[in-house]
């Protein structure tokens, strides 16, 4: 079963090769990586091109013209992975906050459900101990209280960016109805999947702070994403399983 790991990048020159190597070291059959790069000025794309020459059929690069947002990057990556014939698509960050070691667990659980979420907020899940208490509290409140209450979601880690999707699930969601472009993209994808009746399971992960580079998730971005939850509710509150797109 062809599995493609979609990783969006912007200025991840120090991380992109190590994350690729870590994924390949898993030794999983029929697994490849698709990097979606937003024209990084630090040479991330050039590093991927070099890796492509040395590892044909194991890594691909989707160049985008500029930094247009996380949502658009993922939608472009998902569409390309589907075109490439992926039966399973894993999404994750490039900075090792999502450890590749969890990929086999995601894939194993996906045999029984439609979406698997690498979750910080189920039993056994954990956040990096280096997080300040205020940062932890904000993240917990946004996921466990604010977003779940507004959207009446069952998924505990609604902003999780580490997921495994079945091909049929992504096709049934219809990516064209997903409009969020920032970090609220993760919330909208999870909410629509729930409303359409897809089976979602969360597995615990340890979320490590990025090893190298600066986080792109600022306080203003978090506040904006929280406010956009109301837009997600307005757009999709009436969805039912009958609204699944025909694959």
Each model region followed by its residue ranges:
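Cell-envelope/extracellular polymer assembly enzymes that use nucleotide-activated donors
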Residues: 2-4, 32, 188
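Acceptor/aglycone-binding surface of glycosyltransferases and processive sugar-polymer synthases
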Residues: 64-83, 100-183, 210-224, 243
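Short beta-strand/loop segment that forms part of the nucleotide-sugar
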Residues: 30-40, 62-63, 92
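Catalytic donor-sugar/metal-binding loop of nucleotide-sugar-dependent glycosyltransferases
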Residues: 153-154, 177-181, 190-207
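A conserved acidic beta->alpha catalytic loop
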Residues: 37-46, 96
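Short, acidic, metal-binding catalytic loop of nucleotide-sugar glycosyltransferases
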Residues: 21-30
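Acidic helix N-cap motif at the loop->helix transition within catalytic regions
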Residues: 14-18, 42-51
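Short beta-strand-to-loop acidic/aromatic patch adjacent to the donor-nucleotide binding site
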Residues: 86-97
């Amino acid at each position: 079963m062809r599995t493609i790991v979609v990783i969006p990048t912007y200025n991840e020159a120090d991380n992109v090769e190590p994350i690729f190597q870590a994924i390949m070291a898993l030794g999983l059959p029929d697994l490849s990586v698709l990097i979606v790069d937003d024209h990084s000025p630090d040479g991330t794309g050039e590093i991927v091109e070099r890796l492509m020459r040395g590892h044909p059929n194991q890594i691909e690069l989707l160049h985008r013209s500029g930094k247009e947002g996380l949502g658009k990057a993922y939608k472009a990556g998902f569409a390309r992975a589907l075109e490439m014939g992926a039966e399973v698509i894993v999404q994750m960050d490039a900075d090792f906050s999502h450890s590749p070691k969890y990929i086999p667990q995601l894939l194993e659980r996906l045999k029984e459900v439609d979406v698997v979420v690498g979750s910080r907020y189920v039993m056994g899940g954990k956040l990096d101990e280096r997080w300040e208490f205020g940062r932890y509290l904000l993240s917990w409140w946004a996921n466990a209280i604010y977003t779940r209450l507004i959207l009446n979601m069952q998924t505990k880690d609604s902003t999780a960016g580490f997921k495994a999707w079945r091909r049929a699930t992504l096709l049934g969601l219809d990516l064209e109805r997903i409009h969020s472009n920032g970090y609220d993209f993760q919330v909208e994808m999870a909410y629509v999947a729930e409303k359409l009746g897809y089976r979602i399971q969360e597995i615990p992960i340890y979320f490590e702070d990025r090893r190298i580079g600066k986080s792109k998730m600022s306080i203003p971005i978090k506040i904006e994403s929280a406010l956009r939850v109301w837009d997600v509710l307005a757009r999709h509150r009436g969805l039912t399983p009958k609204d699944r797109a025909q694959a």
